[in-house]
Amino acid sequence: MDGQNLLYWQERIDLAAAFRWAARLNMHEAVANHFSLSVNEDGTQFLMNPNQKHFSRIKASDILLLDANDPDTMQKPGAPDPTAWGLHGSVHRKCPHAKCVMHVHSIHATVLASLADSRLPPIDQNTAIFYERYVIDEGFGGLAFEDEGMRCAGMLQDPKIKVMIMGNHGVLVLGNNVSDTFNRLYYFERAAETYIRALQTGQPLRELPHDIAAKTANELDDYPDQAESHFSELKAILDDEGSNYSS
């Protein structure tokens, strides 16, 4: 472990736990996908997973500390994945309110993103979490190198937007910290699964009216300590199992 890896240690531990659980819940994809967490006020200093390492093996000491404004990042030893840099660097540079950014190609979110109509209607409590809180990117332009990353970041300027359904691609989830963001990612995948399975029945959907969907979303926004308790329990499970995620 070098000196850099001693910085933001608790934040690294939280990210490592999120990677481990994303893999356990099958929200990962080979050695692709990426999570990041800003550690300064303007969001330009951020932590992110190393290039080409499986989520199930990432430890706190593996996580990179990057500067979104450093033009030489990709030429340095141990450079991040170029699409991770293009997407997350752009979001942290342009959207300082997005403290934590999680991008995956999880199965149900990606199925939703592959439909001609990628809207997520409020048909239960979990889908209602995201009512009027997501944006659909319908302009997929290839891999998320710098230009594509900047285009995506331009759609996330409104702090109310917590999820980007990335058409033909996957999902991008934003939050205030690791627990908030991972909890949102977990529930988005569950919500997408519920919707996809409901569509598979071929039966009409029981969609909530606008006022009830909006009320439910607001109530869930304010639900006390749910994300923190969820993530604390996930870390406790890893600790009980003797996982090395926090090393």
Ranges and model annotations:
Residues M1-S247:
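Glycine-rich flexible loops
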